[in-house]
């Protein structure tokens, strides 16, 4: 039965039945042959005494499963053929339907088809094959069940069985398609002649080792479980004893053995997408929309191109230049985190396509963007995330293999150009919501080898194959703004000296800011905001941002490349992946915990180059922050250790700047920044002692009977209790950090943070009381000099006042009112709990991937000789559709996946622990000596006479003023750029006789580029002047 072609169907589907034994494999122009395995008995004559066996409604013709047992019915003795009066046996549970399609065309009203129902049900068949029946349908129930909700952009035909248009796949009925009709007994013979979108059944004929009998096509898909008697049909039987049970109505995929031609000795397959997805696609005019491409990569990522692997953007009609390459790394995040990020990325791609006046982008701008998703470990990925990828058409279950010709597969690469997206609520969005096609590349790594290895696949394997201009790095869970990716790309387009850029990372506050009710989330919100207002703009003015966060950052691919000798930013960046044991000292190992900081330094200090890093204010991204104490401590451990040791590395190697091609002005600015960083490192190292001394002198001021606000020496008692409590708590913090994980000591860590908060509240109360008493005391003189007013009031007011001032300048002051109190209350925990735990765990430099080097075999393999391999694949289109249907149902029902327990902590090397001990002892002794010495020297002096407290307060105020000056400079430069760009755009709109430059679009990039390079141009002028002299 030939299927009528719909108007929108691509040629590949309409001509699919010309060769039923051919499967599309590999790129265009190099098709791979797929043929049936020969069987010695294929040409033997089939005995005439063997009659067709009647089948019941659950009968499903398909290929022979290699997992099913041989049918014992096929070995029964020969029986004479039935007479004309023979009536086929029909099970009592199968109703007689006089309007079955087999009787269509009869004149009697008895055989007329019933009118269509108004309730939307699934068809009884799919692509000419029966729907997988549920247990109830096997024993007489209706096989029809309500359809899942169709995508919003599906046409009427996709949402109603009563309509059909060019967006639907027409699946006509025939006598042989009805499992209830009398012609169903001859399904095996008729099935081979049907024509539809689905691939024809592939049959493997093999000799039976036991009896020497041969499989017939009518035997395919039939086993002993299909022979159901009346007694078993009465009920479902006893409940399953144990183990996972398959969902009712889900068809178990059938597989057949096929011979597949290898491409350059590697396994590359192209399979059709599921029918449901195909039915509502807006575009079906190319293979990239109708076929998914799978590649089993058996080499190291560094050898990807050399081994001859190619991506779709390198071959055939899809060969394109890549301007923007987006990397999304994930580990075990759930489907909500993934869809939140992926849907935001697709909306950003739509923004590129809406820029119709751009010389680079436009309606087909999506062809210049490739989104690469790298998952760290096949056994670590969340099952529902795989379902989300399958719903988008990027992933299909049952295709991947563990090995190809005894070579272990290192990564599974899936390529597909999807036209649908899933939002954070798991709802389909398509062209009606502005979603454009998106070229997706899904790399599922076989083993868990951490994030750095995922970036090596991205840069050294796929990046080398595509050679993009700009690479953007994202973490799953981060939601970029609607035009954030465009602003990141624009920073590289307007300034050719920019090698890296980052945006503003925001803490996800939830609906109506409800997450801010958690003090931990509120404190991180304040920290992120002040970093984006003070730190990032300051470093951007200097040209060196110490860290471009991996959650939202971008790099120029050309700037990352190594030199001819193999030395450069990428070689240093990936050096941390091979550091193990005593081959790397603790300093280097901890430094590469923040390898992105090393990459930033290597870019700025690259020999004979003048690369700079830039902060893009218009680029924003929301990310979920830790909301529990154990998760928060574990995250900050790696951040603090990596930042501390990476800062020391850059300070020690600052002389590399002298070999760069930076201007004199830029080098002067960078040296000023290094002095600032040196002070920051020193304050970080002595932060424990400085906090204790601040508490000792400020809170101890209330112990003076002349100042005591409570009287009766109560202030002295409170101070004494809190002082010894703080000392004991710091000692207990060392014990906790050395012997317990945060996940195993939640209550002690939480209690310590509460006590630190109480200490901070009392210290803040003491400071405000002293300030108010000083202001209201008529004997006190409010004048600048060596007094309490100058040392305490002015220094503290300037620090907090600068925070408010800069927040208002950037028009973002709300965090000062909603999150500042929580941050200052948790500030002692930042200085003590986090810092102590980080230094006490400098030995912890592993990522928990030891022992994960055994080749898995659960997916099967591709085995053969020469350039031909034999492998198992889904045999019918129905198998592909069933997997897609199950993925949609899993997403709709939101089935929870059991969470695996924490794995046992791996033993660390004695070398790391011994060095950790020496470092912790040195750090503890240094802070102890400073605290005891200063407290003894100034124990009997007032605040106005305490020079160390004065130094601490004014140092904090000075650093805050320095950051505010840099932030203000950045704001001025940003305002100038906006003004210049606005003026140029206005001049383009004006005619020439009014002073405009209509038609000269090149003026935009040149003018804006000059505006963003103020300091670069100034430095070049100074350098030229010095050379002339």
Curated annotation (Swiss-Prot):
Keywords, comma-separated and alphabetical: Cell membrane, Glycoprotein, Glycosyltransferase, Membrane, Transferase, Transmembrane, Transmembrane helix
GO CC entries: cell septum; cellular bud neck; plasma membrane
EC number: 2.4.1.16
Phenotypic effect of disruption: Leads to increased sensitivity to Calcofluor white, Congo red, and Nikkomycin Z. Results in a 20% reduction in vegetative growth. Reduces conidiation over 5-fold. Does not significantly changes in the chitin content in vegetative hyphae, nor in conidia.
Matches recorded under Pfam families: Chitin_synth_1 (PF01644), Chitin_synth_1N (PF08407)
Annotated glycosylation sites: 348
GO biological process: chitin biosynthetic process; mitotic actomyosin contractile ring contraction
Coiled coil region boundaries: none
Protein localization: Cell membrane
Spans annotated as Disordered: 1-160, 174-216, 234-257
Recorded GO MF terms: chitin synthase activity
Entry-linked CDD domains: Chitin_synth_C (cd04190)
Disulfide bonds: none
Reaction(s) catalysed by this chain's protein: [(1->4)-N-acetyl-beta-D-glucosaminyl](n) + UDP-N-acetyl-alpha-D-glucosamine = [(1->4)-N-acetyl-beta-D-glucosaminyl](n+1) + UDP + H(+)
Feature: compositional bias, Basic and acidic residues: 244-257
InterPro entries recorded: Chitin_synth, Chitin_synth_fun, Chitin_synth_N
Annotated function: Polymerizes chitin, a structural polymer of the cell wall and septum, by transferring the sugar moiety of UDP-GlcNAc to the non-reducing end of the growing chitin polymer. Plays an important role in cell wall integrity and has distinct functions in invasive hyphae and vegetative hyphae, but is not involved in plant infection.
Protein family according to the UniProt entry: Belongs to the chitin synthase family. Class II subfamily.
Protein name stated in the entry: Chitin synthase 2
Organism: Pyricularia oryzae (strain 70-15 / ATCC MYA-4617 / FGSC 8958)
């Amino acid at each position: 039965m030939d299927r009528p072609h719909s108007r929108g169907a691509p040629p590949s589907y309409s001509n699919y039945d010309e060769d039923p034994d051919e499967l599309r494999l590999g790129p265009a122009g190099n098709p791979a042959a797929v043929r049936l395995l020969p069987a010695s008995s294929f040409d033997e004559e089939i005995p005439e005494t063997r009659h067709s066996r009647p089948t019941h409604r659950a009968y499903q013709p398909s290929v022979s499963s290699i997992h099913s047992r041989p049918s014992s019915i096929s070995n029964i003795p020969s029986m004479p053929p039935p007479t004309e009066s023979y009536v086929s046996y029909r099970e009592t549970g199968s109703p007689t339907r006089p309007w079955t399609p087999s009787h269509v065309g009869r004149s009697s009203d008895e055989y007329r088809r019933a009118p269509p129902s108004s309730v939307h049900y699934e068809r009884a068949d799919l692509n000419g094959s029966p729907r997988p029946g549920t247990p109830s349908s096997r024993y007489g129930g209706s096989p029809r069940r309500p359809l899942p909700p169709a995508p919003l952009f599906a046409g009427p035909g996709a949402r109603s069985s009563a309509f059909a248009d060019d967006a639907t796949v027409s699946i006509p009925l025939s006598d042989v398609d009805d499992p209830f009709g009398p012609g169903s007994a001859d399904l095996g013979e008729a099935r081979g002649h049907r024509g539809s979108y689905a691939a024809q059944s592939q049959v493997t004929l093999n000799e039976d080792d036991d009896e020497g009998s041969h499989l017939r096509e009518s035997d395919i898909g039939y086993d002993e479980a299909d022979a159901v008697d009346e007694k078993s049909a009465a009920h479902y039987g006893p409940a399953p004893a144990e183990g996972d049970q398959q969902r009712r109505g889900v068809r178990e995929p059938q597989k057949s053995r096929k011979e597949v031609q290898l491409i350059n000795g590697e396994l590359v397959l192209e399979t059709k997408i599921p029918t449901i997805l195909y039915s509502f696609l807006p575009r079906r005019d190319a293979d990239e929309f109708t076929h998914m491409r799978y590649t089993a990569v058996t080499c190291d990522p560094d050898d990807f191109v050399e081994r001859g692997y190619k991506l779709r953007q390198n071959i055939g009609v899809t060969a394109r230049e890549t301007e923007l390459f987006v990397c999304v790394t994930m580990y075990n995040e759930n489907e909500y985190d993934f869809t939140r990020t992926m849907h935001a990325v697709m909306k950003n791609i739509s923004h590129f396509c809406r820029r119709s006046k751009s010389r680079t982008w436009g309606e087909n701008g999506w062809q210049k963007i490739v989104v690469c998703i790298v998952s760290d470990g096949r056994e670590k990925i969340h099952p529902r995330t795989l379902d989300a990828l399958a719903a988008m058409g990027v992933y299909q279950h049952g295709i991947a293999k563990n090995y190809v010709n005894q070579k272990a597969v290192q990564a599974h690469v899936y390529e597909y150009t999807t036209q649908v997206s899933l939002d954070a609520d798991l709802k389909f969005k398509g062209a009606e919501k502005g979603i454009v096609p998106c070229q997706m590349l899904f790399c599922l790594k076989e083993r868990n080898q951490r994030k750095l290895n995922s970036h090596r696949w991205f840069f050294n394997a796929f990046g080398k194959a595509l050679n993009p201009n700009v690479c953007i790095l994202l973490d799953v869970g981060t939601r970029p703004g609607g035009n954030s990716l465009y602003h990141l790309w624009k920073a590289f387009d307007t300034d050719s000296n920019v090698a890296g850029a980052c945006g503003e990372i925001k803490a996800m506050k939830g609906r109506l800011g409800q997450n801010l009710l958690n003090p931990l989330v509120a404190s991180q919100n304040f920290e992120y905001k002040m970093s984006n207002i003070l730190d990032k703009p300051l470093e951007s003015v200097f040209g060196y941002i110490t860290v471009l966060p991996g959650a939202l950052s971008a790099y120029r691919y050309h700037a990352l490349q190594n030199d001819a000798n193999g030395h450069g930013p990428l070689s240093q960046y990936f050096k941390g992946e091979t550091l193990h044991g005593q081959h790397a000292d603790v300093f280097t190992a901890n430094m590469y915990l923040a390898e992105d900081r090393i990459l930033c330094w290597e870019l700025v200090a690259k020999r004979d180059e003048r690369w700079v890093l830039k902060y893009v204010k218009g680029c924003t991204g929301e990310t979920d922050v830790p909301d529990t104490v154990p998760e928060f401590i574990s995250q900050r451990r790696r951040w603090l250790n990596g930042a501390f040791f990476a800062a020391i590395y850059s300070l020690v190697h600052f002389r590399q700047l002298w070999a760069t091609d930076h201007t004199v002005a830029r080098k002067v600015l960078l040296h000023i920044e290094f002095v600032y960083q040196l002070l920051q490192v020193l304050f970080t190292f002595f932060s424990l002692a400085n906090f204790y001394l601040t508490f000792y002198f400020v809170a101890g001021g209330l112990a003076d009977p002349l100042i005591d606000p409570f009287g009766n020496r109560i202030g002295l008692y409170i101070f004494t209790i809190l002082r010894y409590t703080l000392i004991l708590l710091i000692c207990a913090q060392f014990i906790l950090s050395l012997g317990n994980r945060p996940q195993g000591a939640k209550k002690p860590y939480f209690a310590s943070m509460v006590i630190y908060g109480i200490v901070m509240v009392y210290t803040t109360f003491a400071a405000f009381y002293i300030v108010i008493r000083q202001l209201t005391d008529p004997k006190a003189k409010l004048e600048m000099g060596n007094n309490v007013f100058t040392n305490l009031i002015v220094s503290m007011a300037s620090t907090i006042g600068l925070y408010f001032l800069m927040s208002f300048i950037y028009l973002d002051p709300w965090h000062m009112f909603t999150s500042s109190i929580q941050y200052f209350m948790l500030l002692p925990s930042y200085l003590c709990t986090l810092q102590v735990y980080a230094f006490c765990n400098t030995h912890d430099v592993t990522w928990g991937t030891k022992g994960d080097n055994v080749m898995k075999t659960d997916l099967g393999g591709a085995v053969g000789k020469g350039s031909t391999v034999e492998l198992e694949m889904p045999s019918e289109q129905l198998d592909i559709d069933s997997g897609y249907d199950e993925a949609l149902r899993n997403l709709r029902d939101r089935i929870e996946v059991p969470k695996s327990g924490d794995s046992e902590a791996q033993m660390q090397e004695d070398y790391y622990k011994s060095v950790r001990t020496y470092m912790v002892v040195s750090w503890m002794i240094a802070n102890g000596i400073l605290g005891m010495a200063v407290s003894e020297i100034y124990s009997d002096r007032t605040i106005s006479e305490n020079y160390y407290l004065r130094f601490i307060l004014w140092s904090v105020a000075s650093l805050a003023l320095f950051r505010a000056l840099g932030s203000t400079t950045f704001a001025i430069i940003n305002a100038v750029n906006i003004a210049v760009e606005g003026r140029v755009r206005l001049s383009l709109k004006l005619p020439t006789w009014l002073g405009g430059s209509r038609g000269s679009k090149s003026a935009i990039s040149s003018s804006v580029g000059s505006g963003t390079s103020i300091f670069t141009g100034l430095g070049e002028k100074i350098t030229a002047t010095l050379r002339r002299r």
